[in-house]
UniProtKB/Swiss-Prot annotation:
One of its GO terms (biological process) is AMP salvage. The gene is adk. Belongs to the adenylate kinase family. GO terms for cellular component: cytoplasm. This is Adenylate kinase.
């Protein structure tokens, strides 16, 4: 099982990724984790990436694809792997294709923007303990106060409505086109094309998991 998981921020990809990993016994490939590991280990690509990062630049797709290819050679990838958060752009998808990285499925978790904004902008946190609440789905006993300490809850900057709206804008302009990219490739009938599946990310967590497993058959 070799798959790419797509969906907007706040769609519940992380939760579903954990269930998929467990069911199929495959690792989740995170480019951020790979970069940090390569830099720490001082690999040739890690050294190259560190130079770029230290200068405040963005690590090139070539370096990222190199890291991906190295990562996929490791033993835990023998029965498959799952990409979450990569590729993010068409050039990255092209680079993966040219590098011959095999993909069986592209699974999109679809959630309307209005729902994403409600989910994310409703989050509240008690910073000292890490406890989290939601004004609608998991409210504190007293509005705006932590249940245990009575201290104020805060809305993280990342969860502010305008920040969420900006992240969604980036997703729709850069990452959402990947769905069409992979759909066109699948329709071409070329050998090695992935199957593209779309499921709703609305409803209870176990319902969404059932949809995901059914889509990956």
């Amino acid at each position: 099982m070799r798959l790419i998981l797509l969906g907007p921020p706040g769609a519940g990809k992380g939760t579903q990724a954990n269930f998929i990993k467990e069911k199929f016994g495959i690792p989740q490939i995170s480019t951020g984790d790979m970069l940090r590991a390569a830099v720490k280990a001082g690999t040739p690509l890690g050294v190259e990436a560190k130079k770029v990062m230290d200068a405040g630049g963005l690590v090139s797709d070539d370096i990222i694809i190199g890291l991906v290819k190295d990562r996929l050679k490791e033993d835990d990838c023998k029965s498959g792997y799952m990409f979450d958060g990569f590729p993010r752009t068409i050039p990255q998808a092209d680079a993966m294709k040219e590098a011959g990285v095999p993909i069986d499925f592209v699974l999109e978790i679809d959630v309307p923007d209005s729902e994403i904004i409600e989910r994310m902008s409703g989050r509240r946190a008690h910073l000292a303990s890490g406890r989290t609440y939601h004004v609608k789905y998991n409210p504190p006993k007293v509005a705006g106060k932590d249940d245990l300490t009575g201290e104020d809850l805060v809305q993280r900057d990342d969860d502010r409505e305008e920040t969420v709206a900006k992240r969604l804008e980036v997703y729709h302009s850069q990452t959402k086109p990947l769905v069409e990219y992979y759909s066109k490739w699948a329709a071409s009938g070329e050998p090695g094309t992935p199957k593209v599946r779309k499921i709703s990310g609305l409803g209870a967590v176990d319902e969404i998991t059932s949809r995901a497993f059914a889509a990956l058959k």
